[in-house]
């Protein structure tokens, strides 16, 4: 086993490529988390978007149409979740799991109804997301390996991180969203429509979740496979906890998952048992969640001790 072949320059892009679907999923979860809503349904929204993107791309011959309709499908799924949770007071985790199970069932059913197959659907007629070729990077081998031939959605995820960070921390809307999540009673007293903000957060997350699925099926691959999200939605939620729902820190957490996945794939080529490789992302998930929970507990203890000191004065 040659370490220089495993830890080569191409590993950087492989890490980012593996992390991109998880970053989209994590951003989907981060938006609702800012409103104090745990979006367990990210997995289902993403899976629905993945199937819709492939179906529409195949029928229309347009990858852009596939993405737009996938985002619309994610919007509808998120709308169902928002209505059930906000209007009918259903428990958010139960609704999220229901969305996940429904998405798994409906995509499997529609795969059989529309394409007459099960398991996997792949066809040259599926229009994949284009890759961006930057000619001048060919003169710089290292940068060429890392940055050339990214898909449009891989570039866009970086833009999306910047946009969401700006919205959260530099706009009135973001301030209101965080107020609703942290101090809902105070926000309501200040005249903020708490339910309206929660609806907005969930619906926007649905758009991003649909985009996450579209990238997975049209950018990361060019096919649809039953349950192809493979728990990436849950990994995104874990990364969101790791980053405290901050878009940049959350994305860094996603890169940890991407690195584990990329390293695992390379180790398998050197005879490492496939069971170990398949186990790696889930071990990383447990570690990330454990670290984030411990750091959260430490932070809360510090806050309590600070408050106790102030009271003693």
Where are these regions (language model features)?
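Short loop segments and helix-boundary regions at transmembrane helix junctions
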Residues: 34-38, 79-136, 230-248
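Loop-to-transmembrane alpha-helix initiation sites
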Residues: 93, 120-124, 149-156, 198, ...
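Transmembrane helix-bundle core of multi-pass membrane transporters
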Residues: 104-169, 272-277, 304-313
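Transmembrane alpha-helical segments in multi-pass inner-membrane proteins
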Residues: 206-209, 219-282
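Single transmembrane alpha-helix segments in multi-pass membrane proteins
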Residues: 10-59, 63, 67, 71, ...
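Helix-loop-helix "hairpin" substructures at the membrane interface of multi-pass membrane proteins
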Residues: 145-224, 247-248, 252
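Hydrophobic core segments of alpha-helical transmembrane domains in multi-pass membrane transport
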Residues: 25-26, 50, 54, 104-108, ...
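Cytosolic-side transmembrane-helix boundaries in multi-pass membrane proteins
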Residues: 182-189, 193-196, 267-313
């Amino acid at each position: 086993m040659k370490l220089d072949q495993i830890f080569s320059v191409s590993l950087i892009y492989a890490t980012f490529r593996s992390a991109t679907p998880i970053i989209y999923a994590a951003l989907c979860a981060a938006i609702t988390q800012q409103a104090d809503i745990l979006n367990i349904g990210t997995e289902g929204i993403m899976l629905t978007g993945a199937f819709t993107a492939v179906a529409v791309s195949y029928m229309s011959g347009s990858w852009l149409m596939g993405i737009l309709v996938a985002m619309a499908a994610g919007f509808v799924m998120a709308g169902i979740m928002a209505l059930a949770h906000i209007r009918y007071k259903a428990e958010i985790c139960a609704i999220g799991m229901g969305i996940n199970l429904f998405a798994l069932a409906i995509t499997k059913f529609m795969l059989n109804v529309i394409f007459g197959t099960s398991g996997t659907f792949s066809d040259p007629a599926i229009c994949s997301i284009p890759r961006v070729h930057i000619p001048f990077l060919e003169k710089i081998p290292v940068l060429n390996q890392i940055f050339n031939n990214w898909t449009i959605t891989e570039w866009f995820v970086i833009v999306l991180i910047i946009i969401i960070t700006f919205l959260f921390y530099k706009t009135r809307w973001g301030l209101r969203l965080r107020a609703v999540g942290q101090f809902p009673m105070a926000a309501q007293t200040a005249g903020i429509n708490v339910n309206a903000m929660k609806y907005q957060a969930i619906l926007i997350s649905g758009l991003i979740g649909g985009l996450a699925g579209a990238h997975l099926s049209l950018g990361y691959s060019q096919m649809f496979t039953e349950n192809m999200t493979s728990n990436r939605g849950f990994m995104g939620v874990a990364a969101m906890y790791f980053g405290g729902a901050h878009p940049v820190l959350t994305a860094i957490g996603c890169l940890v998952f991407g690195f584990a996945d990329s390293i695992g794939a390379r180790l398998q080529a050197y005879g490492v048992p496939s069971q170990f490789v398949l186990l790696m992302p889930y071990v990383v998930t447990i570690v990330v969640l454990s670290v984030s929970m411990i750091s959260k507990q430490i932070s809360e203890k510090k806050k309590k001790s600070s408050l106790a000191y102030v009271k003693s004065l």
